[in-house]
């Protein structure tokens, strides 16, 4: 039963704590495919976000140190997606780890992460997305929301990486679009 926030309003408030749990409540299969260790379920912090989903997965081959992590994650996602009938609503969250450090292995001979290796990691992840998008297209029209969880410093103001308070870390790319069947 949806509760209306205002009479005549199209806005509703669910009685679940998170957006993901609310989608599950209205019939979505919710799937999380983790990349970084925050999704590993190996400790308390690694169980929090995956716990919001009906199904959550993490494998070492999805992690930051596996050069083929995005391909592994997309292969896994497509396999899982194809197990559901086309009329089953699916919300899938994928945490692509390839962009996180270390990403220097995406540039031959590079020993340290920098903007060049970060860009190469982004190109690598982007190269894997068409297979995932095609799997969703075969099902139905799909809303895609693509965003980062944080930015990264590569020497700006003397800072490296993202575990700091800096404008570059707070700058997060975002894009949404509809994939048509």
Report each predicted region and the residues it spans:
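Loop/turn elements at helix/coil->beta-strand transitions in domains of secreted/extracellular proteins
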Residues: 26-29, 86-89, 140-141
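Formylglycine-dependent
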Residues: 36-88, 98
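Short, solvent-exposed loop/turn segments at secondary-structure junctions
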Residues: 36-40, 96-101, 150-153, 159-160, ...
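Generic structural signal for small/hydrophobic residues in well-ordered secondary structure
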Residues: 23, 32, 94, 129, ...
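Short beta-strand segments
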Residues: 32-34, 90-98, 119, 145-148
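Single conserved hydrophobic/aromatic residue that forms the stacking wall/gate
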Residues: 1-13
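Substrate-binding rim/cap in mid-to-C-terminal beta-strand-loop elements of soluble/periplasmic
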Residues: 161-181
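A long, amphipathic alpha-helix that forms part
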Residues: 74-85, 107-148, 154-155, 175-181
